[in-house]
């Protein structure tokens, strides 16, 4: 946003301000939106907890001990706390949808090439631009549609047919309860999330002409490997190179890790850890990477066969558990892939607030996936979920 900070939580960018509005902000201004603030993100917008060395840690309005998500965690927390009504986020691995889930609001990652990503930092202009979505975050589901219309513009809105009514009775509903991952870095789906998904499915089955149908994809077991391999499948800079180009003095991942251990690093642990991880992940030329890229393309086609050319949605958890405590995401690093897999599958997705957990008293929700350019189906189902289940709850009155 012109004149405001664009440091993305990186110490070497302290004080850097934007010299122009991002394209999405321009579109919102044209629609009459009044900017109130920019909000906190994770360092370089790479992690699903919004914490950095410049602005500190964003806390969850429902429980200050808990994570607000990332990378758009500040936006999610501000919306949940009624500090603003609407916001704009970006999502390349769930960065709109996880904050929406953790903070009990709504967020939509649009179909590719609908909302311009131009003017962001770090700017992604390579093949990954189709995985990145700039989209609306709202306290109320009914605000998603007019926001998406404003962000997308006339031509893109026409492609999405957002003005067409959706007959929910005619929609086919498919769902998945859990990703059966083999890694200790992914949590099992909690009972609260499982029950919430089940209740939404039960309601939609009573509404639609055909009952909801469970669909499991064996290749989802490798969701993280698919996401990572597709993200790294082309020519793109490594994180350490991006940090260096931002003015960081980071020289070697292991040296930086030693500095972090001694309290001398200017970077957060997730950023340092990811630079170390880059040295050990398989290269894009490796046999395993090529295999997972092929598996990802097959999975993309399976979803196209399921969702394209008909009114159908796919429901699944946005995240396997409600907002975890601060600093714990590093022990469950793969949890983000419930959201992230749909970035590389290039599908529109809406994170829907449903209710507060019975035991955790934290927001619990689901995500609604549709076929490419079928965003209107996600939004229609989100509005119905809000109407029936209530959506956002005032965190000051949660008890």
Regions found by a protein language model. Name each.
Residues 1-93, 307:
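Gly/Ser-rich catalytic/binding loops embedded in alpha/beta enzyme cores
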Residues 8-14, 190, 328-332, 368:
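Short glycine-enriched, charge-decorated loop/helix-capping segments at active-site entrances
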Residues 15-17, 65-69, 97, 125-128, ...:
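Short Gly/Pro-enriched turn/cap motifs at secondary-structure boundaries
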Residues 26, 30, 80-179, 198-206, ...:
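Structural helix-boundary/capping segments
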Residues 35, 211-212, 349:
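Hydrophobic beta-strand scaffold residues
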Residues 41-43, 92-93, 218-219, 320-321, ...:
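Conserved beta-strand edge residues that scaffold enzyme active sites
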Residues 50-54, 101-105, 226-233, 331, ...:
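Short low-complexity, flexible loop/linker segments enriched in glycine and/or proline
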Residues 150-340, 344, 373, 384-399:
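Amidase signature
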